[in-house]
């Protein structure tokens, strides 16, 4: 069966968007609020009608992820910030495979996310309550699968409990995107052998988004 590179690219952009947001949070203590909302909201939607629906039904919601994906795919340098993004992206893919192969882990994750949906009736998605709840899911369900993702940034920024919770919640969104990526036919070999195909697809999607003013 021919692979749907549109869906694969969207899901991959979802992983990369989380990686970029984690990087922004770790270095600056804040990140693109709209992109964060899209990524966190993707955790909640357990029964989406399409790949795009996971990210709010609009390609523009993945602009940060698509731009990051192009940077990761075409990185001529394995140093600095691009290296961080590549490391976060690949680490999320590795953890997703461990999650999918760990007995009962996906069921546990699903049950915990159902709990988030109940909390959303009383609290905003980006409230400290929801951030802490999502961070706790990451710590309880994902972290024990190992290896842990080493987040690098400003030590002063990373000491903040609020930033730590946001980083973990955003990593959980990255795991969600990685699960989706695998479901639509994604695989790590594509990063080596289908790089041009993924690059072309990402550029095509970005080309018909309205430019940011």
Swiss-Prot record:
Keywords for the protein's UniProt record, in alphabetical order:
Cell inner membrane, Cell membrane, Coiled coil, Cytoplasm, Membrane
Q: Where does the UniProt entry say this protein principally localizes?
A: cytoplasm
Q: Name one GO cellular component term.
A: plasma membrane
Alphabetized Pfam families for the sequence: DUF489
Which compartments does it reside in?
Answer: Cytoplasm; Cell inner membrane
* InterPro entries, alphabetized: HflD (IPR007451), HflD-like_sf (IPR035932)
Q: Could you say which residues form the signal peptide? A: none
User: Coiled-coil intervals in this record?
Assistant: 79-126
Membrane topology reported for the UniProt record: Peripheral membrane protein
Query: Which domain of life does the UniProt lineage start with?
Result: Bacteria
The family classification in the record reads: Belongs to the HflD family.
Which PANTHER family does its entry note?
HIGH FREQUENCY LYSOGENIZATION PROTEIN HFLD
Query: This protein is called what?
Result: High frequency lysogenization protein HflD homolog
Q: Which organism is it from?
A: Shigella flexneri
């Amino acid at each position: 069966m021919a692979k749907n590179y549109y869906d694969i690219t969207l899901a991959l952009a979802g992983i990369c968007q989380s990686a970029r947001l984690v990087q922004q949070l770790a270095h600056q203590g804040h990140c693109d609020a709209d992109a964060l909302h899209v990524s966190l909201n993707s955790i909640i939607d357990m029964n989406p009608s399409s790949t795009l629906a996971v990210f709010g039904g609009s390609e523009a919601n993945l602009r940060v992820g698509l731009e990051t994906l192009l940077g990761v795919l075409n990185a001529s340098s394995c140093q600095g910030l691009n290296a961080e993004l590549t490391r976060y992206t690949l680490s999320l893919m590795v953890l997703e495979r461990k999650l999918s192969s760990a007995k009962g882990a996906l069921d546990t994750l699903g049950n915990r996310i159902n709990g988030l949906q109940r909390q959303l009736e009383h609290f905003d998605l980006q409230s400290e309550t929801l951030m802490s709840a999502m961070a706790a899911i990451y710590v309880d369900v994902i972290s024990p699968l190992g290896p842990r993702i080493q987040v690098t940034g400003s030590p002063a920024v990373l000491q903040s409990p609020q930033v730590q919770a946001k980083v973990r919640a955003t990593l959980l969104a990255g795991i969600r995107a990685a699960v989706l990526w695998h479901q639509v036919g994604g695989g790590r070999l594509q990063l080596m052998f289908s790089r041009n195909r993924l690059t072309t697809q990402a550029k095509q999607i970005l080309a018909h988004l309205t430019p940011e003013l």
